[in-house]
Amino acid sequence: MRIHFLLFALLFLFLMPVPGNGGIINMLQKSYCKIRKGRCALLGCLPKEEQIGSCSVSGRKCCRKKK
């Protein structure tokens, strides 16, 4: 039973974001953006695009063409 607590603690530490680097969180957000037919923009969306989310903790935006 104690091994469950140890595994849970290790999983929790693995998923915690490191300051300055989102790691797995950034990867998940980027994948979610691609699934929604978007692209990750560094500064902002183009005039014919709308923001549908974010791609990283650092502020990259997920954009796609307006419908």
Curated annotation (Swiss-Prot):
It comes from the Eukaryota. Disulfide bonds join 33-62, 40-55, 45-63. One of its GO terms (cellular component) is extracellular space. The keyword Metal-binding does not apply. It is found in: Secreted. Its main location: secreted. The keyword Cytoplasm does not apply. Belongs to the beta-defensin family. This is Beta-defensin 103A. It comes from Equus caballus. The lineage of its organism: Eukaryota, Metazoa, Chordata, Craniata, Vertebrata.
